[in-house]
Amino acid sequence: MSTGRAAPLPLSVLDLAPISAGSSPAEAIRNSIALARAAEEWGYRRFWLAEHHFVAVGSSSTATLIALVAAATQSIRVGSAAVQLGHHSAASVVEAFGTVDAVFPGRLDLGLGRSGQRRTELLDAARTPTAQRPSAEPERVVDGLLLPQPFAAAEVVSSPLIGATAAALEFDGAIQPDFGDAVCDVLAFLDGGLRVGDVELHAVPGEEADVQVWVFGSSKGQSAQVAGAEGLPFVANYHVSPATVLEAVDAYRAHFRPSARLSRPYVVVSADVVFADNDSEATHLASTYGHWVHDIRTGRGAQPYLDPTTASPLTAEQRAVVDDRIRTQFVGSPSTVAERLDTLARVTGADELVITSVTYDLEDRLRSHQLLAAEWGLTDSSR
């Protein structure tokens, strides 16, 4: 924070290009570009874009949007958070990012995630009788950081939308590679080529592109382990799975082996933040976040983000589905909430925080990031 940190921990932005109720994908994309320009001015290190399909966000074609953002900015790093390797081949990913890197060299972060492949595991878990499932960890507070009881994602992952999405994005009969193998294929294409049988394939463009590879994960499972074993930086998703953030970073560090890319573990932790000039305003702006998460968790996917001035409050039953996410949001004025972000960084040992903020109006999203940049001490011009 600006009041005590001589060298502030770097902050980055994770943007979903959310579509607000009554708005359009085109406006959401323009808003993301505007936010990226502002983030660069305010001293944020990176601007990352999520990949989601067939829902009310504008970032489905992540590499395309990354190129648009890179063209609209000068120096901020731009990347994916994360490419869903279950829906893309390693070759297509490297060629896409290599193409953008050819025009904007040295500015791209290639974040890789397991979506698509992980769905099969969750479906298997959903089919397991409740009595045979491991009991959930109880809620706890570790050195000031809230770790709520884990959400049972297996209960909703079998929704028709998720199944239809997989069917639309994957070829019939295609066998998805193991996530670790897919990551290694990406690295091979970037480093000099991938041998398939007796043929060595070279990604053009893509080979030797100046792209930094990241792995995203929410638990102590394969993503954290692969990131560590391959010597890659790791992003732990506190904003999506707050209950498991510590086990994720611990597993990553335990499996870490130095590589040509990274000599020591590097951890980024995500946080969902809504800052405003006072606590009551911030609470009002964040009041429809629970509605948005509820749609996602009950299988409808992200719907247009509701206007807090007209939306009805969540019912008690709806609130129970999203309670962990609401209570682990960082909502308020900078003076009352920034210390909680400091706690998140300290307890997880994060080298960097990545901030996501979803509000109905772009102006409120911009103001949230601006206030945080000023409070954190990223730049004197943030206030």
Regions found by a protein language model. Name each.
Residues 1-78:
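N-terminal beta1-alpha1-beta2 module of alpha/beta enzyme domains
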Residues 2-7, 130-204, 243-348, 380-383:
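An alpha-helical appendage that flanks or caps ligand/catalytic pockets
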Residues 11, 39, 43, 51, ...:
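Conserved, mostly hydrophobic/aromatic
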Residues 15-30, 60, 82-91, 207-219, ...:
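Active-site mouth loops of central-metabolism enzymes
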Residues 89-137:
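A generic, well-ordered mixed alpha/beta core segment in the N-terminal half of proteins
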Residues 222-243:
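A conserved active-site cap/scaffold subdomain adjacent to cofactor or substrate pockets
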